Structure formats: C-alpha cells, structure tokens
C-alpha cells in the first residue's frame, strides 16, 4: 500500500480489511440472534473467530465457481444425507455454500454432517503432499480440532444454510478411556448444538492400521464410555466397524459388534456401511444384517460408500459375487423399513456429490413409497437429538 493510499484509507473510506472485520461482526450478531440460547452465547463469545474467513470463503466459492457435476437422473426423491464429512483427511473442504449448491442439484434437503476424526500426516521425507489416507504409507493421527472446524464454520453460516445440517462430533480417540470426558467438554462448549456422535472408527482396515496407537475395537472400554454418555444425552452414535478383515471370508469382528450392542441397550448405534470397506468380501451379508437387526433393537445401519456399489449393485472391482442381489437387499429393507438410512459419505469436496446421492434411485425405485420416506428421511430424523 502506498503512502497516498494509506492516507486515503485513514479518512472516511473503510479499508477492505476493516470492512471484512465489521461485516464479520455484523454477520456474527445476526447469526447468533437466530440460534438457540446456548449456541448463541457460544457464538457471541467468539469475536472474529471463523466469521471473517467465512465471508472470504463465500466470495471465493462464488468467484472460482467450484465445479459440481449435475446429476444424470431427474430428481425424484427428497433425501436426508445421513453420512457426510465436511472435511477430507487433510481437514480441508469446499465449504458449506458449495455443499448446499451440490445438495440442491441432488435433491438433498438436509444432511448429517461431521468432520474427519483422523488426519493424514505429510511426512518430512515426502516431497508431494498426500491427498487421501491411501496416498502413501505415511501415518495418520487423531485430530480433535475437526469438531471445532465444523462447529465454527457451521455457526458462521446464515440461517438458511445452518438449518439444513445436523452436526455430529467425532474428534477423539475412542481407545482412550478419557474419550467420553473429551466428548462431554465439546458438548459443553457448544450447548444444544450437537445432534449425535460419530463417525467413530473401529476396525477400518488400512486406515486404522496406519493410525498411531492400538487398533480400535467397538467393545473396548473407551467405546463403552462413549456409549454410556450417548445414552445419557440421547445422542445416537455412528461407528465404522468392519465385519471382518480384508482378503478373508471368515467373519472375524462380528462378536465385537454384538457385545457393544448388548452393553447398553439405551444407546442407539448406527453401523456405517453395514460393516464393509475396501477388499472386505464375504458371503451372506444380508443374512448377517437381518440377524443383527432382529436381535438388537438399538441397531440401525446406513447404506453408504462402497457397500452399495459392491454388495447391492454387484460392482466389485474383481468380479467377486457375494450371493445377494439388489432384490434381496430390497426385501431385507422391507422387513426392517425403520432401521435403514442412506448417505453419500463424501469427504470435503462436492464435485461428484449429486451422482453419489442419485445413485440410490435404483434401490429406491424397488421400495414401497412408505419405505422410501423412512430410509430417505424419517429414520434419521427419529434418531438424531432434537433441541
């Protein structure tokens, strides 16, 4: 800035930096006025936190026009996305305004949103940064700031964006017996804000193998403390727990899930992806899911990520066949219509978001209209904490 420009800006004109600061304060006050009392107080106590950067982010999202591919299907269903990460494994995101644009294109009116509780490390020996947890063999680590990124960014949004999301907290190590204490602190910092807990990682093949510390398992004492807290607070818990290891058809980890479900029947657990991940290939998954749902009234499942492409549509990359067809899955859902939900499992970037949402139309077209309403919206709404 030249001396002349500095002198000019010191007069009646307002500099761009000062304008952003003042605009952020005004946005904060307006946003806080529409929030529940506890959350409004939390917002008011954070002058200049994420609000100024949010205003810049909105402008950037508009100016650079983040590419979002429109769906190839005509929108026919109103969906609540039950599984959506606001950030990727580098804790980066295209932001809420672009996400809402993608949701609008896909016919998704609301979403359960959470961060990424595990971050990918960029090792000093690597010239190129990773872009995904499988980019290289660098380690991953638990990242507690992810909850604050989600909370601050969401609180910074105008009401019409904020009211579309149900935030879950996930930034803790569930192996730690202090995990429930950490979650309680986050709940206290953002009162009447969090609608659930998750996605928590347990038995996530390469991801948990790359993460510092012992491999997490859903029936460990840290998890059990989370379940007790969730039951007391009325919060559902979303857990990724593989049904078995990679490259074996033996079901190795099912008993851990059963013990977790039996531990506290007042804790409602959502089983992410029906226990499936990359290279997890088993026979009879519909039978396993059916038996679990019959025996555990506190279990729900989300259909998201690879389980739909591989197991519902038989699109395994190696032509593996698990023995079940799309009709078998539709029949299972009709037997338990109040226990399923669908999600995109997108991670921070929204270019292909519409395609991930409308891909479920092939399944939805096979279901009764009442069942469609349940798995597209009502089941998730019945679970999440309402204030």
Task: Spell out what each predicted region is.
Residues 64-67, 96-99, 148-153, 179-184, ...:
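Alpha-helical scaffolding within the catalytic cores
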Residues 87-95, 119-122, 140-146, 172-180, ...:
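Acidic-and-aromatic substrate-binding clefts and catalytic sites of carbohydrate-active enzymes
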């Amino acid at each position: 800035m030249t001396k002349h420009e500095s002198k000019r800006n010191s007069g009646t004109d307002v500099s761009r930096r000062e304008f952003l600061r003042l605009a952020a304060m005004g946005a904060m006050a307006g946003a806080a006025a529409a929030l529940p009392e506890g959350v409004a107080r939390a917002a008011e106590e954070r002058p200049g936190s994420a609000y100024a950067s949010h205003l810049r982010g909105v402008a950037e999202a508009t100016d650079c026009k983040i590419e979002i591919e429109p769906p190839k299907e005509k929108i026919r269903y109103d969906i609540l996305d039950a599984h959506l990460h606001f950030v990727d494994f580098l804790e980066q995101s295209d932001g809420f305004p672009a996400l809402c644009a993608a949701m609008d294109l896909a016919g998704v009116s609301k979403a359960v949103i959470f961060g990424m509780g595990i971050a990918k490390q960029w090792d000093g020996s690597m010239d190129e940064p990773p872009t995904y947890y499988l980019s290289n063999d660098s380690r991953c680590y638990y990242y507690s700031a992810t909850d604050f990124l989600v909370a601050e960014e969401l609180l910074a949004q105008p009401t019409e964006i904020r009211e579309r999301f149900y935030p879950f907290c996930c930034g803790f190590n569930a192996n730690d017996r202090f995990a429930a204490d950490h979650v309680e602190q986050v709940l206290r910092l953002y009162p009447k804000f969090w609608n659930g807990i998750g996605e928590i990682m347990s038995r996530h093949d390469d991801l948990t193998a790359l993460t510092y510390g012992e491999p997490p398992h859903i029936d460990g004492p840290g998890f059990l403390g989370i379940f007790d807290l969730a039951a007391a607070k009325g919060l559902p818990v979303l857990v990724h727990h593989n049904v078995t290891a990679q490259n074996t058809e033996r079901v190795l980890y099912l008993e851990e899930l059963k013990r977790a479900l039996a531990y506290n029947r007042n804790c409602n657990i959502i089983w992410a992806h029906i226990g499936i991940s990359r290279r997890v290939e088993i026979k009879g998954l519909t039978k396993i899911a059916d038996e679990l749902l019959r025996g555990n009234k506190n279990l729900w499942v989300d259909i998201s990520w690879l389980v739909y492409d591989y197991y519902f549509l038989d699109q395994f990359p190696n032509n593996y066949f698990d023995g079940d067809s799309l009709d078998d899955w539709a029949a299972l859902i009709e037997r338990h219509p109040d226990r399923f939900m669908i999600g995109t499992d997108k991670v921070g970037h929204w270019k292909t978001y519409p395609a991930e949402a409308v891909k479920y139309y092939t399944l939805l077209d096979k279901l009764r209209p009442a069942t469609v309403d349940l798995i597209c919206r009502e089941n998730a709404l019945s679970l999440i904490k309402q204030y």
